[in-house]
Each structure stands twice: as C-alpha cells, then as structure tokens.
C-alpha cells in the first residue's frame, strides 16, 4: 500500500465585529464580492457575521503557518476597509443568535430550511484541519485511531465559555451547541471503507441526507 501524502490544509472561521459595540455584524456580503465570495480563499459561511479562510494544500507545517499568517492579515484588511474588526473564539460572548442573518446562498438557505432554528442557533466558529490520505481503508483506520484523541484535542483548544451574555460554566459551549445538530460528535468505529460507504448509502436512500457531505462528525472523510 502506498503511504499517504499527509498533505495539510486548514480552514478557520472568524467573527465579524463592530469595533464600537463589540457586537457581531452581519456584513459578509459587503466585505466579499462576486467570484471572490464563492471561489476565493476567503469565503462566507452560514451566518453573515462569519468569514472563513482556507489555505491551499500544503506539504509542511511551516507552509501552513505561512498561509495562515497571509490569510489572517488579508481578512483583517478587508474588514478594516469596512470599519470592522475580526475576532477568533468558539462563540461570541453576548451577541444573540436570534438576530443573526443567514448568508443568502442556496447552500445555506437550504440548511436553514431543513434544520430551522437548529441552524439559526449554530452561531459557532471553529478550526478545521484537512489531512491528505488517499487510500480509503487507511483513512478509515486513521479515523478509528483519531476517535480516541478528539476529547484531548478539544481540552487543549477550548475557547467558548460564554454564550448569550452568560458564563456557561463550561470551557467549550461550542461543542454543546454543535451537539444539537444531527450526525455530529465522535464517529462510530468503522470496519472498513466499504462499511462507511454502506452507511452513507443507507442515509441517502432513506432520505436522511443528499450525500456524505452532510455527515458532520468531528473526524470524517471529505466529500467536497
């Protein structure tokens, strides 16, 4: 079996903030325009008060770091041109999810229609790490091992103790909010890529999901 390439890519989601009130601002469609909004390295997300960056495919951690420094600087400049600032945390400490506007793209409007207030409440921000593993069975084996480490990684990365103006008493309230969504959390142990494919096929045939991209486990294959 050919060893995996182990290429790296990272996506980061940021809060768009009014510098005077410190409230979230639903302003992504004004910050981004045209093709850049859909195809660029800086993209919209479910809520208009969120912006996402995505690195190119990288070969080393040093390349990833350089990409993140470049993209973080760029998104801060874009926000500053519109009199706004960027913040990074798993949740906003006091802005209300009820008043946030959904990004008017078919993908996000569909999620809002399907999941109603569960989608509206999903006002959370995160970091997603993509690792290149070409062999599907190796990928499933890696997922099975990674399941054990997910709680440890979460412990090291918590950044969301506040929600709706309250100290929740938890270090990662983000994970509690995301738990309300279907098909989330730590994935089950899977025997093989074939078993995973059968699971996805069952979900599609029964009308639970249109495709595997709607499985949102903490560790999962990429269907994009």
Which residues make up each language-model segment?
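An acidic/histidine-cluster motif and surrounding catalytic segment
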Residues: 129
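Glycine-rich, histidine-containing beta strand-loop boundary motifs that form or position
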Residues: 88-92, 133, 157
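Short strand->helix junction
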Residues: 58-61, 132, 136
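Terminal catalytic/cofactor-binding subdomain
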Residues: 1-125
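Loop-rich catalytic cores of soluble enzymes, especially ATP-dependent carboxylate-amine ligases
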Residues: 104, 134-224
């Amino acid at each position: 079996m050919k060893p995996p390439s182990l290429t790296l890519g990272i996506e980061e989601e940021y809060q768009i903030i009014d510098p005077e009130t410190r409230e979230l601002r639903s302003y992504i469609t004004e910050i981004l325009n045209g093709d850049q909004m859909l195809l660029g390295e800086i993209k919209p997300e479910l809520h208009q008060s969120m912006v996402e960056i995505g690195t190119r495919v990288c070969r080393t951690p040093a390349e990833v770091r350089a990409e993140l420094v470049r993209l973080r600087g760029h998104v801060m400049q874009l926000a500053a041109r519109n009199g706004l600032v960027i913040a990074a945390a798993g949740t906003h400490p006091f802005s209300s999810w009820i008043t946030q506007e959904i990004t008017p793209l078919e993908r996000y409007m569909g999620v809002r229609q399907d999941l109603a207030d569960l989608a509206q409440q999903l006002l959370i921000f995160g970091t997603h790490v993509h690792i290149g593993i070409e062999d599907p069975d190796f990928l499933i084996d890696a997922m099975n091992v990674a399941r054990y480490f997910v709680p440890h990684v979460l412990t090291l990365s918590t950044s969301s103790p506040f929600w709706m103006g309250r100290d929740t008493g938890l270090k990662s309230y983000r994970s509690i909010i995301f738990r309300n969504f279907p098909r989330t959390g730590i994935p089950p142990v899977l025997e093989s890529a074939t078993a995973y494919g059968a699971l996805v096929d069952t979900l599609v045939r029964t009308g639970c999901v249109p495709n595997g991209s709607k499985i949102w486990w903490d560790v999962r294959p990429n269907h994009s």
